[in-house]
Regions:
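First exposed extracellular module after export/assembly in secreted or surface-exposed proteins
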Residues: 1-121
């Protein structure tokens, strides 16, 4: 399987929430595959939540099947959305990971630069 994302914005302001749409592309014998997702906040500070506002906990995993809004209509390409809200004025870097019950893991790093809304003179 592979993990990818829809277009991501490059900058985020403090307090701003951005959408991260993920694609889980499956191939081979995936009929009995079960997945879990987690993330690690490498740089900056912020919160990751699902489409119902439930926060994911940094460095903990959650079953992907329990993700609200998980689109399983196409069994080969599952789609789900998470939201990131920056709570600091620093650059944010997050590493998302999905692993299956066969021991395989895929990672994707997401980076947002800070957006300076006021220019100091």
């Amino acid at each position: 399987f592979s993990l990818s994302s829809w277009y991501l914005q490059k900058q985020v302001a403090t307090g701003e929430t951005v959408e991260i749409r993920f694609y889980l592309d499956r191939e081979g014998d995936y009929e009995k595959a079960e997945y879990e997702i987690g993330y690690i906040q490498i740089e900056g500070k912020g919160e990751v939540s699902d489409s119902e506002g439930m926060k994911l906990v940094n460095r903990e995993v959650r079953p992907l099947a329990e993700m609200p809004g998980l689109d399983t209509e196409n069994p080969v390409k599952q789609v789900f959305t998470l939201f990131y809200r920056s709570t600091s004025a620093k650059r944010s870097e997050l590493k998302f990971f999905v692993r299956d019950n066969f021991g395989r893991e895929r990672e994707m790093t997401v980076t947002f630069d800070t957006e300076n809304s006021a220019v100091k003179e």
